């Protein structure tokens, strides 16, 4: 009888947030050292160019693929010769549900890449090591700060667009 007095869960109740890793994998990997062994005969004064980006796409209901793209290009300061170019696309499939739009954006551009970064960092380090170059240990990335910068840029662009629209009237 006590069970009859309980109300069943309704669709309007808040859904609990879910973030689960389904799979982590290497989507693409490349290591190029076109000027070997010539660069080994020069003084090692590297100039490092590091690029990072993310991509996300929905695969199905509550299922998303997130790709973390890392590119490290190292040239020698004195000669400008390319020492190596290392590109890694570390990806993961995630189950994500119960999030508002802004929370979902944060999850796809910050939380998921944060989970992928250690795998990508290890790949880059191993590839550089296999090329017999000095160790390269990428510093941790604050994806939350990058997400906040992105939001601020969007807000600034929105304000600039509104200002130019007001001036045209």
UniProtKB/Swiss-Prot annotation:
Gene3D superfamilies reported in the protein's UniProt record: SecB-like
Q: In terms of domain of life, where is this protein from? A: Bacteria
Alphabetized, the UniProt keywords read: Chaperone, Cytoplasm, Protein transport, Translocation, Transport
Q: Which GO terms describe its molecular function?
A: unfolded protein binding
One annotated Gene Ontology cellular component of this protein: cytoplasm
Q: Which GO terms describe its biological process?
A: protein folding; protein tetramerization; protein transport
Q: Where in the cell is it found?
A: Cytoplasm
Q: What is its main location?
A: cytoplasm
The record's section on Pfam families has: SecB
Q: What does this protein do?
A: One of the proteins required for the normal export of preproteins out of the cell cytoplasm. It is a molecular chaperone that binds to a subset of precursor proteins, maintaining them in a translocation-competent state. It also specifically binds to its receptor SecA.
Q: Which family does it belong to?
A: Belongs to the SecB family.
What is said about its interaction partners and assembly? Answer: Homotetramer, a dimer of dimers. One homotetramer interacts with 1 SecA dimer.
Q: What is this protein called?
A: Protein-export protein SecB
